[in-house]
């Protein structure tokens, strides 16, 4: 009789354990399912991608970013963003891409655009300083600190204007262009086309800048005169050591 009672208690305890285990398993599976659903339906954010597919579901708007003063100048600069929102699988995707730059001259109380049309996207805008290593734009902009700001003499740009690989997107996988402008943004000029990869740049010496890039699977270097905005020489690197 006692053995039957003991067996009965053990069976009840096992039933409770099995029930608790089942509930925990259900809760775990439910949490996993909720996580998967949230991940599948959330809005994904990407940068420097423009969707050019003929899709009525793509919602686009432009937005001007924050104005920041250019070091060594009273002129301010701000990016123009193209923001696209479109369906992606079970959720949505939002892309933010820089299409242009606007400048403001507080002395003349006027604003102007770097390019006459806002198309394609800018992958980078690099501020160049005289007789020193180039610095990222956000590091040379005027700031409230005791250090003397380094004047910017020009900007170097890497941009993409066309969908060259026909994937219905404009991004860094397409062929690029390399361009320059003066520090005030009033003399924008594209100097190099059909760039597969931007490989870097040198310090400015005697108002000249060397730009390294890949084109036709070959690494090349272009020497640019910043005053005339012309390429004074262009050569290839040897493909063999």
Regions found by a protein language model. Name each.
Residues 121-156, 194-212, 231, 238-241:
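Conserved beta-propeller blade repeats
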Residues 13-35:
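Hydrophobic membrane-insertion alpha-helices, especially the h-region
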Residues 163-172:
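Acidic, glycine-anchored loop motifs typical of Ca2+
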Residues 44-65:
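Short extracytoplasmic/periplasmic juxtamembrane "stem" segments immediately C-terminal to an N-terminal membrane anchor
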Residues 100-104, 174-183, 225:
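Beta-propeller blade signature
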Residues 64-125:
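Extracytoplasmic/periplasmic/luminal assembly and interaction segments
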Residues 115-118, 191-195:
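Surface loop/turn motifs at the tips and blade-to-blade linkers of beta-strand repeat domains
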Residues 112-113, 187-191, 233:
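A short beta-strand motif characteristic of beta-propeller blades
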């Amino acid at each position: 009789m006692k053995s039957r009672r003991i067996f009965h208690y053990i069976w009840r305890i096992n039933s409770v354990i099995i029930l608790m285990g089942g509930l925990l398993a259900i809760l775990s599976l439910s949490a996993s399912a909720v996580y998967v659903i949230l991940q599948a339906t959330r809005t994904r954010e990407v940068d420097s991608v423009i969707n050019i597919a003929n899709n009525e579901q793509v919602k686009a708007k432009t937005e001007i970013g924050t104005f920041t003063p250019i070091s060594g100048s009273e002129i301010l600069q701000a990016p123009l963003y193209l923001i696209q929102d479109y369906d992606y699988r079970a959720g949505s995707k939002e892309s933010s891409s820089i299409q242009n730059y606007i400048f403001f001259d507080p002395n003349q109380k006027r604003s102007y655009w770097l390019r006459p049309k806002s198309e394609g996207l800018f992958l980078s805008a690099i501020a160049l300083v005289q007789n020193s290593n180039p610095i990222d734009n956000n590091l040379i902009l005027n700031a409230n600190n005791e250090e003397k700001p380094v004047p910017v003499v020009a900007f170097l740009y890497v941009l993409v204007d066309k969908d060259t690989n026909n994937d219905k997107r404009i991004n860094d996988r397409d062929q690029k262009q390399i361009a320059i402008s003066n520090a005030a943004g009033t003399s924008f000029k594209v100097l190099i086309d059909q760039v597969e990869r931007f490989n870097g740049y040198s310090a400015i010496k005697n108002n000249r800048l060397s730009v390294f890039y890949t084109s036709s699977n070959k690494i090349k270097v272009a020497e640019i005169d910043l005053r005339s905005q012309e390429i004074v020489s262009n050569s290839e690197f040897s493909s063999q050591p």
